[in-house]
Amino acid sequence: LMSCDMAVFVTPLYYYNVSSQLKHVIDRFYSFTGELTARRLKTAFIVAAWDDNDWTMEVVETYYKTLCRYMSFSDQGAVYGTGCGSAAMTRRSAHMREAYELGRSLK
């Protein structure tokens, strides 16, 4: 993480937040917060959820934005994939195109 150009955090949505696996990785940042914050690392965020309610991603979106603010990450974009509970659902959604466009926009 200290030598990469960018980090992309990808997770399924579990009870309106990131998975425990991703949370564990983020919690490990604590031991080198100062060094990581000084890097102003570029980041992106991709989340997939079965639900497609308009409020489904509110908590996880706030979590990611707060993490970026606290860690001085440079947010390059996010894909909040609601209605993506299976591969077929995801293919029918607009979120595949959103992820593609996010990737194309990165410099």
Where are each of the predicted segments found?
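Helix-loop-strand module that forms the ligand-binding subsite of alpha/beta enzymes
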Residues: 1-71
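Glycine-rich phosphate/pyrophosphate-binding loop and the adjoining helix
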Residues: 65-107
